[in-house]
């Protein structure tokens, strides 16, 4: 991944201890997995909004939260609806979407919010090591360089062959 989000002054957003991640499927699933796996190390509260559970959404304090809205197309209906429910003119928002004419980009510009370009060659379910997963990881207080090292490890042919062999052995043992 490239740190396309580093051009945004992230320091001003690190003060938030409550962060809403709004998106669907792969746009937030990788970040949700990172948060679930490393929750004991993370001192912030992350809320993953990917459906229309209005009771949960309505109970969130809109003033003291950072909203991170993620949609590759920028036109995902559920993401748009949830964003409109959770945002207000004074809320702090960061949008990650393709650099194309889309609803969320228009909304971000109208609200004078930060916009980070979602790389158009990365699909949602494969995006955890891109800005879609690494910006939330950074806001969680995690060292994104360690993820970059993991990315290099995954590209290593011998590591992958060993991993596949071990997974196969584990599956065989579980039968």
Regions found by a protein language model. Give the residues of each.
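Low-complexity, highly charged intrinsically disordered N-terminal segments
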Residues: 1-19, 29-30
């Amino acid at each position: 991944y490239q740190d396309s989000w580093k051009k945004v002054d992230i320091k001003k957003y690190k003060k938030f201890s409550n962060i809403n991640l709004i998106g669907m499927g792969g746009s937030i699933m990788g970040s949700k997995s990172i948060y679930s796996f490393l929750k004991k190390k993370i001192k912030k509260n992350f809320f993953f909004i990917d459906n229309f559970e209005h009771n949960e959404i309505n109970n969130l304090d809109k003033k003291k939260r950072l909203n991170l809205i993620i949609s590759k197309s920028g036109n995902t209906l559920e993401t748009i609806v949830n964003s409109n429910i959770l945002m207000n003119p004074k809320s702090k928002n960061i949008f990650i979407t393709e650099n194309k004419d889309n609803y969320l980009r228009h909304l971000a510009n109208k609200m004078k919010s930060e916009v980070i370009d979602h790389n158009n060659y990365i699909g949602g379910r494969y995006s955890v090591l891109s800005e879609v997963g690494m910006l939330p990881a950074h806001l969680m207080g995690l060292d994104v360089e360690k993820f970059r090292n993991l990315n290099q490890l995954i590209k290593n042919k011998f590591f992958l062959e060993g991993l596949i062999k071990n997974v196969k052995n584990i599956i065989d043992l579980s039968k």
